[in-house]
Amino acid sequence: MGPNGEFEFHETCPIDKLVRAENELCALIGPQKAFEMGVAGMKYAESPPGVTDIVTAMQMFDAAYHINHLENGVPMFDPETGTMREGIGHYRCLSISRHRAVMEVDVPYPCDFDRGLIQSWARRFERTALVTHLEPSVCRKNGAPRCRYEVSWK
């Protein structure tokens, strides 16, 4: 914590340690608080250039995720070249329409934390956005390799 009571992010943190800590913390605090932690964490995230509406935001979520992760001090997505480094999973926008997107997620972070991240990101662009876990039986909590979420808005 910083002097103003806000959480202070350091420029780099090894991804394996960060993921392990987040998974342990989310297991301790439970699904609702993990969701809230994801919502809060998104306020610190950098947005790729050109994201101005919810449709573009959902299509660019994976780029935003990679921009906000560093490998050897370099963002894992370069918007100027379109180069994306692998190794931390993806947030794929499988389909999108005027009021709905389906996201497939295979990142190492906890499912409930991801729901919070996605909802917070979507609400930057559309305040009515709501995230629902599709196929709850197919979930990383149960050992599945991915989760799917529906993002809907009015």
What are these regions (language model features)?
Residues T81-R115, R123, R127-K154:
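Short terminal or interdomain "cap/linker" segment that borders an active site or interface and mediates
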Residues M1-G2, E126:
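Glycine-centered secondary-structure boundary/capping sites
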Residues G2-C111:
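Amphipathic interaction/junction segments at domain boundaries or subunit interfaces
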